[in-house]
Amino acid sequence: MYGDATNWNEDEYRESILKEREIETRTVFRTAWAPPARISNPDAFVVASSDGTLAFHSLNSLVSQSASFGYSKGQDVMVAEPERVVRAHEGPAYDVKFYGEDEDALLLSCGDDGRVRGWKWREFAESDVSLHLKENHLKPLLELINPQHKGPWGALSPMPEINAMSVDPQSGSVFTAAGDSCAYCWDVESGKIKMTFKGHSDYLHTVVSRSSASQILTGSEDGTARIWDCKTGKCVKVIGSQDKKSRLRVSSMALDGSESWLVCGQGKNLALWNLPASECVQTIPIPAHVQDVMFDEKQILTVGAEPLLRRFDLNGALLSQIHCAPCSVFSISLHPAGVVAVGGYGGIVDVISQFGSHLCTFRSSSL
């Protein structure tokens, strides 16, 4: 017995196949829990993806939807429609941060188009932006555009991408790690560059703010991490080998709450530094390349090019490892309540409780 082909539409079928493949090959580069962080029960978080979108999801809604779906380690996961979505960038959105800790915070994102864009979080969360609208109907409140370098005869360089951001609301600053091997300090009020940090020989992967010492730290493809003085723009210390033959890119870094300890992801290793002593006190080997790292008080969380979330103590002892749904994980986001959201290849986000159980696993619908 054969099906009825009278209503067959080849164009619609082709479009549906392409859409399905696009969703399955999307990458989540960053997840971020929304303020106010003081709320003990986490709910709202934002997902930045390779299709340039920012999607806002409600954890409570996702958990109720996934109750009947179950946990999947493969690509067969629940597809969830976000509460709100906006196309933030032309090209991938690489990072998302909240500037401020209350409902008046700014939602900031950066991406491959060399721009930082910002929205009022309250307006973003309450906006009526339809998932099915192709155009961006929620205009950014803030837009910072990377400078282009002028060459011979006035020719401008391509727009360098922005791979990561860090925020310092105390000084009114946003720091960006760019593809032109420079880091930039932006004034949020004026939208102007306050300082340019030059010294790396290759593009930057990451930047973190150390506000207690008026410093930033950057990690680069050139295999080094650098500490910079925000008052002078000068590099005060270079961390890591400068030997081009043995260097491995510094892909991620994080500071602890005291801003005395720094952990760097470099190749298949974590390097733990005591900053006041300027000493690397621990090197922790990892089976796969590190792609994100963060502190949870006196412990280190890390993910990489494998479907595992690992937790270490400061002595390098492995405390736990939890299997997660993305086959390659690019992002960890920790809520103060202990809930972790990881995102990665396939556009998959896996939300894990403080006890190690999977609260929900999903793929966000796209524009």
Curated annotation (Swiss-Prot):
SMART domains: WD40. Transmembrane segments: none annotated. One of its GO terms (cellular component) is nucleus. Pfam families: WD40 (PF00400). Its main location: nucleus. Pathway: Protein modification; protein ubiquitination. It comes from the Eukaryota. It is found in: Nucleus. InterPro entries: THOC6 (IPR042626), WD40/YVTN_repeat-like_dom_sf (IPR015943), WD40_repeat_dom_sf (IPR036322), WD40_rpt (IPR001680). Keywords: Abscisic acid signaling pathway, mRNA processing, mRNA splicing, mRNA transport, Nucleus, Repeat, RNA-binding, Transport, Ubl conjugation pathway, WD repeat. GO terms for molecular function: RNA binding. Disruption phenotype: Increased sensitivity to abscisic acid (ABA) and salt. Gene3D superfamilies: YVTN repeat-like/Quinoprotein amine dehydrogenase. GO terms for biological process: abscisic acid-activated signaling pathway; mRNA processing; mRNA transport; negative regulation of abscisic acid-activated signaling pathway; protein ubiquitination; regulatory ncRNA-mediated gene silencing; RNA splicing; ta-siRNA processing. Component of the THO complex, which is composed of THO1, THO2, THO3, THO5, THO6 and THO7. Interacts with ABI5, DDB1A and DWA2. Acts as a component of the THO subcomplex of the TREX complex which is thought to couple mRNA transcription, processing and nuclear export. Component of the CUL4-RBX1-DDB1-DWA1/DWA2 E3 ubiquitin-protein ligase complex that acts as a negative regulator in abscisic acid (ABA) signaling. May function as the substrate recognition module within this complex leading to ABI5 degradation. Functionally redundant with DWA2. This is THO complex subunit 6. The lineage of its organism: Eukaryota, Viridiplantae, Streptophyta, Embryophyta, Tracheophyta.
